[in-house]
Curated annotation (Swiss-Prot):
Originally annotated as the product of the F18R open reading frame (protein F18), it is now referred as protein F17 since there are only 17 open reading frames in the HindIII fragment. Keywords: DNA-binding, Host-virus interaction, Inhibition of host innate immune response by virus, Late protein, Phosphoprotein, Viral immunoevasion, Virion. GO terms for biological process: symbiont-mediated suppression of host innate immune response; symbiont-mediated suppression of host type I interferon-mediated signaling pathway; viral protein processing. Residues 51-73 are annotated as: Disordered. Self-associates to form high molecular-weight forms. Interacts with protein OPG157/A30. Interacts with host RICTOR and RPTOR; these interactions disrupt the mTORC1 and mTORC2 crosstalk. One of its GO terms (cellular component) is virion component. This is Phosphoprotein OPG062.
Amino acid sequence: MNSHFASAHTPFYINTKEGRYLVLKAVKVCDVRTVECEGSKASCVLKVDKPSSPACERRPSSPSRCERMNNPRKQVPFMRTDMLQNMFAANRDNVASRLLN
């Protein structure tokens, strides 16, 4: 990456007249001059398109306790992690048997 650029990985909020925006990734640019402009006179103002969906609604807060903590006997199902290994082994065995026959 160029030495003039630094990436900010921490999400943050920007409060604007239109609402609050969550910035997931930002790029900091160094050694770039700032052009002052007034929104009523200039065309260099950031354009923000209004969302077509209804305004954001606050969701109720999540429950304070995890469901797993309430029922310790209930086991969490795990996905088979050896699935790819078994697929490759079966493919290898099929190819080997074809070559030997």
